[in-house]
């Protein structure tokens, strides 16, 4: 399995992971052999890359639970994005507490591992997907520690919000990844601190 950036996707490549829309509806299933039109659709959907299977690689098995987890991650990511966009505009979040409750109910009671891999659509998606992943792991760790539900909800909400300041960082800095200057790093720190002021 390889991660291939959108501009490098070629017809005939096969998807290793399913692609879902914001509502968790399946757009492309695993093992889909990509056509030119599929690639246009993936590009229009805003993906920065996808996981593909190597030419001779068999489709790896995936459990129903792993499939649901992939779907939920995408659904949660878009819900979180809607909430954080509202907050960044000075509005109340639409359903951040509902999202925290969903994550806590679903993952704050698990007694087994889950497999994390993420398909990031854009540099800002990093914030949303990463925050959702941290929230899920926090709910699982909190459950293992025997924390009360009210405490789990607080921890999950904190996980959703802790990287919020990255949304204010100028796009040209975010696109640089690790190739940032000391001045740009200071700028990022200021935006992250500003988010909590």
For each predicted feature, which ranges?
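Acidic/His-rich, divalent-metal-binding segments that scaffold phosphate/diphosphate chemistry
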Residues: 55-189, 193-197
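Terminal helices and disordered tails flanking the catalytic cores of nucleotide-processing hydrolases
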Residues: 1-100
């Amino acid at each position: 399995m390889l991660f291939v950036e959108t501009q490098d996707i070629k017809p005939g490549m096969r998807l290793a992971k399913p692609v879902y829309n914001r509502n968790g509806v399946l757009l492309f299933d695993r093992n889909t052999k990509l056509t030119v039109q599929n690639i246009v659709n993936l590009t229009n959907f805003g993906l920065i890359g996808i996981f593909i299977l190597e030419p001779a690689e068999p489709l790896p098995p995936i459990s129903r639970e792993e499939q649901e987890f992939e779907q939920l991650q995408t659904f949660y990511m878009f819900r979180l994005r809607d909430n954080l966009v509202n907050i960044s505009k000075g509005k109340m979040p639409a359903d951040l507490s509902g999202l925290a409750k969903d994550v806590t109910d679903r993952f704050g009671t698990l007694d087994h591992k889950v497999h994390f891999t993420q398909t990031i659509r854009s540099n800002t998606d990093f914030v949303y997907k990463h925050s959702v992943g941290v929230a899920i792991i926090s709910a699982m760790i909190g459950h293992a520690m025997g924390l009360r539900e009210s405490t789990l909800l607080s921890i999950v909400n904190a996980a959703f919000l802790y990287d919020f300041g990255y949304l204010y960082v100028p796009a040209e800095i975010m696109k640089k990844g690790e190739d940032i200057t000391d001045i740009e790093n200071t700028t990022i720190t200021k935006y992250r601190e500003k988010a909590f002021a």
